[in-house]
Amino acid sequence: MPVENFMSTFYFITRRISEINEMVLQFFREAIFSNHNSRKLNVINSKFVTRDDLIDTIDPTIFNDPVEILNLFLSITELSEKNSQIKIVGIYPSCVRNIRTAKRNLKGFLQNDPRAREIFLKIISNPNSMRLAFKLMHKYSILSIYLPQWPNLVGQMQFDMFHTYTVDEHIYRTMKYIFDVSHNESRDNSEQLFKNIYNNLPKHSLLYISALFHDVAKGRHNGRHHAEEGSVDAMDFCRLHKLPISDCRLVSWLVLNHLEFSKTALRRDIYDPIVVQDFAELIKDEIHLNYLYCLTVADICATNDTEWNSWKQALFRELYFSTLQAIRLGPEHSIDWSQTIKDNQEEALTELCRAGIKKERVLALWKNFKDQYFIKNSGNQIFWHTNNILAYDPATNVPLVLFGQSTNKIGTELFIYTRDYTGIFCRIVSILVSKGISILEASIMNSKDNFIMDTFILVDRQGRSLSHDKIVPLQKILLMGLINTEHPLPKPVPLSKKFQQFKIKSVVQFLDIKGADETGVTHVEISTLDRPGLLALISSVFQKCRININAARIATTGERADDGFSISNHQGKALSQEEKGHLQTQMLEALHRLDEQN
């Protein structure tokens, strides 16, 4: 794309200008305010010194052998490791000039030199390189003369509403996040979990190499997914640097699957044992799980400043520990949720009895609740729901509509309890989206006596929890809309201009999850352009095709929606091939019509 080429050139030129400006200003300071020889001199080794807090060469011609460029950064790394009294904050301007000259004269890439490979491996294998050495290597484009893939990444923008940084900057920030969280005080539980897992990794260097290569193949436009291309590059790199074959395979696997953890956590029903077991079979063992968790979290946190939130933290934590349990039990054993059910029931029952509600009434009500309800909801949520349901009179035919703060701190939780009827989910969703409400997650469930027990996590247009001023009228609108079923569904707000700039091909994909059909469930993912009314449209197609929604996971990445659904046909069975084909056709046609309307 011309705009991509323009922006890449723009970033490249601005970086060079910034580099030259910094170098020239430093020379001016030398000439005006001080003398070159008056600076405090510290000898690092036989090749490098520091002038005050800037590293310099002893011999200005040393970079005639370009491998010595890497030795410069290895010296910085080793000083950081030793916590030396010699402090370095940057590179002396004449040294920068000599590096620039050596780069221009270089033929080929440094990784072709076995001496350079040995030095680079020492740098990336030492986490202390992330304190300063890698920052300076990134700043002065050293990776562009080492890795053949790197020059194409420098300044490459990702034209979406998700990625804030260029590809090279994002990769550097991913590596920096790994170091920062693992070596600093934890600010929250998610960072503490990351730190605990990181500390148990057998080789930290493999995580840094995986981070270096996870997006290295972006922008090649050759029809293959960047994860597939990158895994090949990672394997070639590891073999070239003579890593053990087991390490080569692990790094290549991590790059290939670096999106799988987030896809599973955000798009699929992670409380379904079949889903967890299928994911555990992909992961294979605890080592792969630990590496993948750390890489995924670092990748997300290095994407933009708002992507990692407490809602995603909770999902990732749940998937991590569920998968860990599945791996330890082995494929022949299903995950035992009985203790989770017991703990949540006991916690809720204690609070209900404390509130003066008789235990017999509670247990009588709970007989109508399925096990999945007690797995998916915490003790506090079960208490909140049960307390209100016991005070509710179903004979009035007025739905029970409750609002509260989400247990994950992100969003407002909406709980609806009422007698089920055809199209009720579509009606709920249509009302919400017509008021500009975004749905982060939907848990659809029926009791044994045919009452819906649907939970939604909602945010406003700015991604914030709903204010009290919005909740009160929304509650009234939901009540009226669910009671007056003859009223037509509200129309969604038009697609904003910023979304109209994006073209995303709609895809309806049925997942092949082993054992899912036997449980009467089919898993489907729908990827398309995010737009107002999308979820309402999807649910209306399900209704038209007589499909029941058992669970929904709504994942929005910038302008892209990747929604996952657990569904069954009107007989409560998994969809046949014929039913899948019919649903796919109807869904794609409906999405195409929505595109034309916008």
Q: What kind of region is each of these model predictions?
A:
Residues 1-163:
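Non-catalytic interface/linker regions that flank or bridge core catalytic/transmembrane domains
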Residues 42-56, 139-159, 165-216, 220-221, ...:
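Active-site-adjacent "gating/activation" loops or surface patches in catalytic cores
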Residues 106-117, 186, 238, 244-248, ...:
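Conserved catalytic alpha/beta cores of large enzymes that bind or transform nucleotide phosphates
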Residues 118-119, 126, 163-166, 170-173, ...:
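A glycine- and charged-residue-rich anion-binding loop/surface
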